[in-house]
From Swiss-Prot:
Role: This is one of the proteins that bind and probably mediate the attachment of the 5S RNA into the large ribosomal subunit, where it forms part of the central protuberance.
Lineage: Bacteria, Pseudomonadati, Thermodesulfobacteriota, Desulfobacteria, Desulfobacterales
Name by which UniProt lists this protein: Large ribosomal subunit protein uL18
Organism of origin: Desulfosudis oleivorans (strain DSM 6200 / JCM 39069 / Hxd3)
GO MF annotations in UniProt: 5S rRNA binding; structural constituent of ribosome
An annotated GO BP: translation
The encoding gene: rplR
Subunit structure: Part of the 50S ribosomal subunit; part of the 5S rRNA/L5/L18/L25 subcomplex. Contacts the 5S and 23S rRNAs.
Entry superkingdom: Bacteria
Length: 124
């Protein structure tokens, strides 16, 4: 087994451990984060119904075509994605969430998304 596969396997084990303990509800959905090598994705999920309320990612046109973000590093884009999902959540009437780091270390871009969401007005 390669080192990359081992890292992913360990991340998936961490993710399963976390998901056993937390779940999103309609009043307090789960803010789920996924981080790829190039992009970051965030979504608000109600686990009782299996419904996604709001999504935001660095791969969508609102972020890609934003002239303020050209030349910014991935962490700065992640903060913007956090603010974007917070704004969309406010539009849906959601103010409080449960944070799901998805097995990723709470550091770097994952932390940047949560900081941006907090700045945008979401309570964790």
């Amino acid at each position: 087994m390669g080192a990359a596969n081992k890292k992913q396997e360990l991340r998936l084990k961490r993710k399963a451990r976390i998901r056993k303990k937390i779940a999103g509800t309609p009043e307090r959905p789960r803010l789920s984060i996924f981080r790829s090598a190039r992009h970051i994705y965030a979504q608000l999920i109600d686990d009782t119904k299996g419904v996604t309320f709001v999504t935001a990612s660095s791969n969508e046109p609102d972020v890609k075509n934003n002239t303020e973000l050209s030349g910014k590093n991935k962490s700065e884009v992640a903060v913007f994605v956090g603010k974007l999902i917070a704004g969309r959540a406010k539009d849906k009437g959601i103010s409080s969430v449960v944070f799901d780091r998805g097995g990723f270390v709470y550091h770097g871009r994952v932390k940047a998304v949560s900081d941006g969401a907090r700045e945008g007005g979401l309570n964790f």
